[in-house]
Amino acid sequence: MLAFNNDYSHGAHPAVLQALVDTNMEPQPGYGTDAHTERAKQLIREACQAPDGDGVFLVGGTQANATVIDMLLAPYEGVVAAETGHVACHEAGAIEFGGHKVLTIPGYEGKMHAEDLENYIQVFYENESYEHTVFPGAVYVSLSTEYGTLYSKAELAAIHAVCQKREIPLFVDGARLAYALAADECDITLPELAQLCDVFYIGGTKCGALCGEAVVFCGMHAPAHPIPRIKQHGALLAKGRLTGVQFEALFTDGLYFEIGRQAIETAQALRRVLHERGYQFFLETPTNQQFVILPNEDMARIREHASIEYWEKYDETHTVVRFCTSWATTQEDIDALAAVL
């Protein structure tokens, strides 16, 4: 069965897995105080050109989103996100479970507009009863977005400017950051991203690691006492070395960026095949997620040979599905899918 339904169906990149094997018998202290975690943090600071950056490692994207947002907010605050943002529609209420409301504004192919953000905050404070409502305390965006689209440098800078004006932090979800940075249309570098937000995370789970996300506080200091706060969310690994070793490997010799390029190259090949077969795209995306409108009978036929992700109902006879590539996708996989299509 061909795997095109997501970018986390495989295990770890061989180099990451080898690093885990090579360090397996080393006794190391727990909870992220080991030498590999410290080395990984230093490599990430260097890659971000952020010598004063601080960071923590978390086990997965939901844990990263829920924990970081909780760290950023006071009990009476919520996080502003596009209505199509991951925390608004695909986190099963994890943010709300932690006591914070997701405050949604319009989304356009997965992205929010700075003007809508400014207007939302302005209207909030114009309300004479605002003390009786949930305060906008942080802003959440993702790179790439839930729809595989990208913020341009200018778009992200405009959102960041609103956040600075309003003195609220901007949090960038980078679960698929390797694939965003590798896209031809991306005009943001990793060091620039570190300058355009207050906190972001570098995705590992979808980008070559068995698990793990690296949270980077770049425009602000890490909140006080992160360890107990992470632990309260059930997101602290006793064997913190697990994430440290993996990110040490990912940020050695440019592996993280190589992983991104591999997924984008196969996504481009996939896009060509889908265009050649005459399928209609739900929207055009430059990253590793491709969204296509399939006749329901075609979806059923393809699923006999390949895993593809249901996205949403288009009409009575068509469905929007997601085809996804990853670091593990090969040209042979694309050729095999082309034969199925």
Residue ranges and their predicted role:
Residues 13-61, 83-84, 88, 94:
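Conserved N-terminal alpha-helix of the aminotransferase class I/II PLP-enzyme fold
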